[in-house]
């Protein structure tokens, strides 16, 4: 089975052609600078192709994608008919979507309804969907929402303590993001530990970071909120702060709210604390060379991650498994070690030698650790492909 996975941004479109059963990616690429001058980056195995191709809209980007996939020299299929379905990443499903779903007119209207909650991403996601529908009208299309996995949270976790009319009229609540990654890691961890009923905290740590408390495969709480700005401090995002900071800064420095939020989203986090970089590798190098601000940034990050693990351990009444995933979670052993050092009170113990390895799926806790600690490389594209295949096969 061939699933085409589409992740449409405002001026870009990422794609992968994948077998959902084996996880084998036959081709992948990126259409970038859509609406400007257009460039295609295409990869099959170790072979890379870069072409400058005009792409005024996402429709041309989809057409370019399908052409290169069928290309005699660089393609992997002979006909579009070999694509069984298309899975689209959609950022925000709001309160409309609790799971992935086959796209029809009603689904598109509901995604449009969620645009106020995802004003940057949802319109781009819709452009990708409509472009695919135009070029592949008979091929099933599936929407996979970044927020859906977190929709099993109870009201005590997702409601904000603000007047009810903002929830009832404007759907203001905690939604959470990186849901496809959290879902994949939760499923994969269940396979690794050999059971479905257990309590876990997953740490998706990267330039954008989020954590989730999961019980028996269902999300109970997560760190991001109405937007991805909430939770732990990130590469350039502040994470949780006193909301009154916004008013204080706006009043003192003459900023408007949009300018202040731009600062909190793009000029804060590790970049602000270190004064050097948002990249954890740069911070590690800086700390080793005696830069105290770089050391503080990394320590602040580990401290906040550990705090949320502790909070979620309380919310779940204990945890059985702690998982690390995404760029920093999979590759930065020093961050994992420091987080786990904070969690000694939970009986967390890790093997330093195992923890020193990068990017590999493995158990890094010791046999006498009271909590299993795993590194589980995420695979959001595979999760999208599997969700898409399950829905399409069920509809036959």
Residue ranges and their predicted role:
Residues 149-252:
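Glycine-rich phosphate-binding loop of actin/hexokinase-like ATP-binding domains
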Residues 68-83, 189-194, 309-320:
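Phosphate/pyrophosphate-binding loops at sites that engage ATP/ADP/AMP, CoA/4′-phosphopantetheine
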Residues 3, 12-55, 225:
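Short glycine-rich, Thr/Ser-proximal phosphate-binding strand/loop in the N-terminal lobe
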Residues 262, 269-273, 280-315:
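Adenine-nucleotide phosphate-binding core of ATP-dependent small-molecule kinases
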Residues 295, 299-317, 329-396:
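Internal helix-turn-beta structural module
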Residues 8-9, 88-91, 205-207, 323-331:
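Glycine-rich beta-strand-to-loop/alpha-helix junction loops that act as flexible
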Residues 69, 73-121, 142, 149-159:
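Short beta-strand-loop/turn "lid" adjacent to the catalytic site in phosphate-handling enzymes
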Residues 215, 221-256, 262, 326-357:
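Catalytic phosphate/nucleotide-handling subdomain of diverse soluble enzymes
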């Amino acid at each position: 089975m061939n699933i085409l996975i589409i992740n449409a941004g405002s001026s870009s479109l990422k794609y992968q052609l994948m077998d959902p059963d084996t996880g084998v990616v036959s081709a992948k690429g990126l259409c970038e600078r859509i609406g400007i001058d257009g460039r295609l980056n295409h990869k099959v195995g170790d072979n890379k192709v870069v072409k400058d191709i005009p792409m005024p809209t996402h429709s041309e980007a989809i057409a370019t994608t399908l052409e290169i996939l069928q290309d005699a020299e660089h393609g992997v299929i002979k006909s579009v008919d070999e694509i069984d379905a298309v899975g689209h990443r959609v950022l925000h499903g709001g309160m409309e979507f609790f799971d992935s779903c086959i796209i029809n007119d009603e689904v598109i209207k509901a995604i449009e309804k969620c645009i106020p909650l995802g004003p940057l991403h949802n319109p781009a996601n819709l452009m990708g969907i409509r472009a695919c529908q135009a070029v592949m009208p008979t091929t099933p299309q599936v929407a996979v929402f970044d927020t859906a996995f977190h929709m099993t949270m109870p009201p005590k976790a997702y409601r904000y303590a603000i007047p009810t009319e903002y929830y009832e009229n404007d759907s203001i609540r905690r939604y959470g993001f990186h849901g496809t990654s959290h879902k994949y890691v939760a499923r994969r961890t269940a396979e690794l530990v050999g059971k479905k009923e257990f309590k876990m905290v997953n740490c998706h740590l990267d330039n954008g970071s989020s954590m989730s408390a999961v019980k028996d495969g269902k999300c109970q709480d997560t760190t991001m909120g109405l937007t991805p700005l909430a939770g732990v401090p990130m590469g350039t995002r502040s994470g949780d702060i006193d909301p009154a900071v916004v008013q204080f800064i706006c009043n003192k420095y003459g900023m408007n709210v949009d300018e202040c939020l731009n600062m909190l989203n793009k000029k804060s986090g590790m970049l602000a604390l270190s004064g050097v970089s948002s990249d954890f590798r740069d911070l590690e190098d800086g700390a080793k060379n005696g830069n105290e601000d770089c050391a503080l940034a990394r320590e602040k990050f580990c401290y906040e991650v550990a705090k949320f693990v502790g909070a979620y351990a309380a919310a779940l009444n204990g945890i059985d498994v702690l998982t690390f995933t995404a760029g920093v979670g999979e590759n930065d052993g020093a961050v994992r070690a420091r987080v786990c050092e904070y969690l000694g009170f939970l009986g967390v113990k890790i093997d330093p030698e195992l923890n020193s390895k990068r990017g590999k799926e493995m158990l890094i806790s010791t046999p006498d650790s009271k909590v299993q600690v795993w590194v589980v490389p995420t695979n959001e594209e595979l999760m999208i492909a599997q969700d898409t295949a399950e829905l399409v096969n069920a509809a036959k």
